[in-house]
């Protein structure tokens, strides 16, 4: 089996995490997984949604979108269509669920964190790149809240979160699929994990033939291996 990119089966794409990428947001990152590039920002606003009023905890919510020419052909803006598509809604809910798992909301205080992930160039794995980059932006946003005198109850950060794709490509498990691999893969899996080794989400779909338990285990093992590298890259970015 030869991957289109020439990478080994267990090799991640080149990953770069650039912090403080925009000027105004409390946390901002440009994350690059190969040719996939996503701007992730975290904005802090006082107050919480109505359903959390008086409960003594904060909230985090996420939005996701793609520039019209992030892909090979121009896509119409969802705003001009008047509604978000099902894929967009699914991905932004995934991002929100994943990042909430990083936090103890009771220590966040009466604030809402708005995570915005905007894909400026797509070559596969946009949702996993979004989660990985937004996690770093979230850490920076928490530092800003603390500097402003918040987080009196202690550090709300419980653990780091990251995500990666794995799949069965030409009968073999491969790590971090790009678009060419993703479009031809027999199975595509998106895996979200904590830095302590737990799974937050595993999204898997077979195209054509179903995948077998042994293949699932092989893909999850590959995801765990890749995730260890990604967590190291997150920590290195935060150390700069």
UniProtKB/Swiss-Prot annotation:
HAMAP family: RNase_PH. Homohexameric ring arranged as a trimer of dimers. The keyword rRNA processing applies. One of its GO terms (molecular function) is tRNA binding. Phosphorolytic 3'-5' exoribonuclease that plays an important role in tRNA 3'-end maturation. Removes nucleotide residues following the 3'-CCA terminus of tRNAs; can also add nucleotides to the ends of RNA molecules by using nucleoside diphosphates as substrates, but this may not be physiologically important. Probably plays a role in initiation of 16S rRNA degradation (leading to ribosome degradation) during starvation. It catalyses: tRNA(n+1) + phosphate = tRNA(n) + a ribonucleoside 5'-diphosphate. Pfam families: RNase_PH, RNase_PH_C. Keywords: Nucleotidyltransferase, RNA-binding, rRNA processing, Transferase, tRNA processing, tRNA-binding. Belongs to the RNase PH family. Its EC number is 2.7.7.56. It comes from the Bacteria. This is Ribonuclease PH.
